[in-house]
Amino acid sequence: MSAPELAAWHEVLASGDPASLRALLAEDACFHSPVVHRPQQGRELTAMYLGAAFRVFAGTDFRYVREIASDTDAALEFTATIDGIVVNGVDLIHWNAEGRISDFKVMVRPLKGIEKIREKMAVMLESM
């Protein structure tokens, strides 16, 4: 992973464009949700979950407050306020040799934040 891949992630996040998101994901991408026990395997499921998250955080004060990156991985700490609940979390992203996201793990705190995200994500996923 290099600066262009991380910059591409930030651009897709800002745009919320589903086609651009899919283009960033490896065919065998895996998404690890803070509220779903099993990892979600494959580009389509990963895109679906990330797309729902984009919609949950749209219109909030979501922002990354810290970034730690290496050649193939990044840890991106974020904060957002959803319905008055301050949420703090970390996106752990791994890029494969082709520069596509192959693993995306989300960790969130506090418990009230996880519960609120779960509630909002369920609504978004049902509408997709």
Residue ranges of model-derived segments:
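Alpha-helix N-cap/loop-to-helix boundary motif
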Residues: 1, 13, 38-42
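Intrinsically disordered, low-complexity regions enriched in Ser/Pro/Gly/Gln/His and often acidic
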Residues: 1-2, 88
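Short acidic-aromatic low-complexity motifs
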Residues: 2-27
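Exposed alpha-helical structural elements
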Residues: 8, 20, 45, 113-116, ...
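A general structural-boundary detector
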Residues: 8, 33-36, 80
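A solvent-exposed, acidic/Ser-Thr-rich amphipathic alpha-helical stretch
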Residues: 18-20, 24-71
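A beta-strand edge to alpha-helix "cap/lid" segment located at domain peripheries
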Residues: 54-128
